[in-house]
């Protein structure tokens, strides 16, 4: 089977697992009033830029260490960024283990810890917020290449043959690409990096 097809299928599968767990389709899971103003959560993403720390979520677009959401669908009822009529915003799980389970099942995904601000809608398993700060990035200690179990010491650039999108993956010496960053040398003053 085509490698690009499998990569795209894994991406769609991971995205649907996350969306099904958190999406606005489960409106009956809202808490009493459904809104809070700040909360900590966990999610998964791809790292797309190292120097400026840019991430790509499983749903819409890219974001930085500190970002505000906007309606990607341009729905008239969605004049306020986060509301019950739209699915836009930054999603996060309450439970750290849900993000780590997704990352373990789909190599290349990176669990991160975030703080959501602004208008936040609370659901049974997670939340959706207006603004987001990435406060911690969790990087695997092992190489993300297939069944390799060597120590991952680099973040290596990989460009998808399917959609030409780039991401940085944890790689060992043997599987590193031409564009690499040593994990130990990445600036820790911008973000807390935790190895697991």
Where do the model's predicted regions map?
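ADP-ribose/NAD+-binding catalytic cleft of ART/PARP-like enzymes
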Residues: 1-88, 100, 104-125, 145
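Long, amphipathic alpha-helical segments that form or neighbor coiled-coils/leucine zippers used
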Residues: 130-136
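Cys/His-enriched microdomains
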Residues: 138-146, 167-170
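Short Cys/His-rich metal-coordination motifs, predominantly Zn2+-binding knuckles/fingers
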Residues: 145-151, 175
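Short Cys/His-rich "knuckle" micro-motifs
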Residues: 151-161, 180-186
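Cysteine-rich micro-motifs
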Residues: 162-179
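Long, low-complexity intrinsically disordered regions enriched in Ser/Thr/Pro/Gly
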Residues: 187, 194-196
């Amino acid at each position: 089977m085509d490698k690009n097809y499998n990569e795209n299928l894994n991406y769609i599968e991971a995205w649907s697992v996350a969306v099904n767990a958190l999406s606005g389709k489960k409106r009956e899971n809202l808490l009493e009033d459904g809104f809070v103003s700040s909360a900590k959560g966990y999610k998964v993403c791809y790292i797309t830029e190292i120097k400026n720390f840019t991430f790509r979520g499983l749903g819409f677009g890219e974001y930085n260490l500190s970002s505000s959401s906007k309606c990607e669908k341009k729905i008239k009822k969605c004049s306020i960024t986060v509301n019950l009529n739209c699915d836009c915003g930054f999603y996060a799980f309450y439970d750290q283990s849900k993000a780590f389970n997704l990352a373990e099942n789909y190599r290349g995904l990176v669990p991160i810890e975030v703080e959501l601000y602004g208008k936040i809608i609370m659901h049974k398993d997670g939340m959706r917020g207006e603004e987001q700060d990435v406060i911690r990035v969790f990087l695997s200690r092992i190489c993300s290449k297939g069944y390799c179990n060597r120590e991952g010491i680099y973040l290596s650039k990989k460009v998808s043959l399917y959609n030409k999108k780039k991401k940085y993956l944890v790689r060992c010496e043997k599987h590193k690409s031409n564009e690499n960053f040593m994990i130990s040398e990445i600036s820790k003053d911008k973000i807390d990096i935790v190895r697991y």
